[in-house]
Amino acid sequence: MTKTMCAAVQMASSPNLGANLIEAGRLIEKAAAQGAALVVLPENFALMGMVETDKLEAAETEGSGPIQEFLARTAERLKLWLVGGTLPIRASKGKVHATSLIFDDRGNQVGRYDKIHLFDVNVPGTEEQYRESHTIEAGEHALVLDTPFGRLGVAICYDLRFPELFRQMADTGMDILAVPSAFTAQTGAAHWEILVRARALENLCYAIASNQGGFHVNGRETYGHSMIVDPWGKVMAGLPSGAGIVTAEIDPDRLEKVRAAFPALQHRRMHCR
């Protein structure tokens, strides 16, 4: 594990896939210019459709398609590791997976995570209703993979509310957590920062949380406040709203010192009832 500059990208994606890819490319280039070697895109970075079924029409087969080509080409050209937010990958029964693909600095796909927990809720205090399960097939497996920067875990948006997933990831040796997200304005204001900081500090890891942020053509408003959090739960950098990036340095010495001084993961007593 080496000291590394990382970046979280924040966007307000639209139904226009081409325009979204141009904007994502611009922001990734900005991150690269600031020295970022690891960049995380938000959930639905390539498409925020007018209706949920729009993602079915834009779905790709793993290994081919314009979104995947963009991610691979950008990672290789800028020589950085890229966590590709989410994109719709074809699944069974006419549905898609909400998939995050990870590309190394040579443009090779080195990891895949399919969103496990689907957002089927009525947002309290609003008329907003979401039923991701109508178009998305849930994933089944957590992901933690080796990178030059440490062990990288990936989770997506609503997953943040299920701490057992992250503890499973920590048990395999997670150093950095990437969380592509699209939190609503209402749920974000209530819970976003609390959840991101909690997942980082309770698992003693860095968290790179990239959120959609702003008003969307489909009428939706997302919360923004993309952030990078250290293993003590401190927000190192954040962006309240609008398109942009946040950058911060992941320091393995800082990680080691926090874990050595506060070895909470070693103090678990799961046999107690």
Roles of regions detected by a PLM:
Residues E62-V83, R151, C157-V246:
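CN hydrolase (nitrilase-like) catalytic-core segments centered on the catalytic cysteine
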Residues G84-T86, T99-I102, L143-L145, S226-I228, ...:
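Short beta-strand scaffold segments in enzyme catalytic cores
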